[in-house]
Amino acid sequence: MKYDIIGDIHGCLQEFQNLTEKLGYNWSSGLPVHPDQRKLAFVGDITDRGPHSLRMIEIVWELVIHKKEAYYAPGNHCNKLYRFFLGRNVTVAHGLETTVAEYEALPSHKQNMIKEKFITLYEQSPLYHVLDEKRLLVCHAGIRQDYIGRQDKKVQTFVLYGDITGEKHADGSPVRRDWAKEYKGTAWIVYGHTPVKEPRFVNHTVNIDTGAVFGGRLTALRYPEMETVSVPSSLPFVPEKFRPIS
């Protein structure tokens, strides 16, 4: 099986359409379909900050749950939206406010439909996908080699948020260790979460979050070819979001 793994979309629907078309997908049915049966995989954070979060929920639900033709691993923004839809007490900030504004503008029956689709998508998707006979892992923020195969709370925190230290940068964002430098496995780990200006290959890991929602690019990794394909963002560039990884 051949996969096209898509970085953090964050509601950037036009960029997602442009990228999939560049990858050879056809949208005539209303969904991206590849003539050679390649499968899409998403590293999570499909919503928040960008203009079309709810449409992205519908598309990914259709591909993953209804048609079972794609793979989705939830991100930290997905986790927060899931908790919001469950009625938990979450702070509507850091991008969630854009998704909530879209949601609250809908009539109640459409709200219920979106809520049910996203809850189903989240609950029926694993923390990370192990594909191609364990040669490929797709997850949101990465995973340590000794965590592969586990699903406990410690692993969930790592997969959703990265290798956080508990410390904060001056802007309030978490300080993260560079786990990829320590990875010694042979399986390729493809992830996003931390915006980088260029796809970052370190050992057998690839960060493909090139900051589409911050004016960078939306990037896909073609597997097993190990080629990256990107399209430019239509949004303003926010340079401070592309923090160097120590």
Curated annotation (Swiss-Prot):
Reaction equation(s) it catalyzes: P(1),P(4)-bis(5'-guanosyl) tetraphosphate + H2O = GMP + GTP + 2 H(+)
GO molecular function, one term: phosphatase activity
GO cellular component: cytoplasm
InterPro entries named in the record: Ap4A_hydrolase (IPR050126), Bis(5'-nucleosyl)-tetraP_PrpE (IPR023937), Calcineurin-like_PHP_ApaH (IPR004843), Metallo-depent_PP-like (IPR029052), MPP_PrpE-like (IPR041780)
Keywords: GTP-binding, Hydrolase, Nickel, Nucleotide-binding
Needed co-factor(s): Ni(2+)
Enzyme Commission number(s) from the entry: 3.6.1.17
Family listed: Belongs to the PrpE family.
NCBIfam families: PRK13625.1 (NF010148)
Described function: Asymmetrically hydrolyzes Ap4p to yield AMP and ATP.
PANTHER family membership: BIS(5'-NUCLEOSYL)-TETRAPHOSPHATASE PRPE [ASYMMETRICAL], METALLOPHOSPHOESTERASE
Designated name of the protein: Bis(5'-nucleosyl)-tetraphosphatase PrpE [asymmetrical]
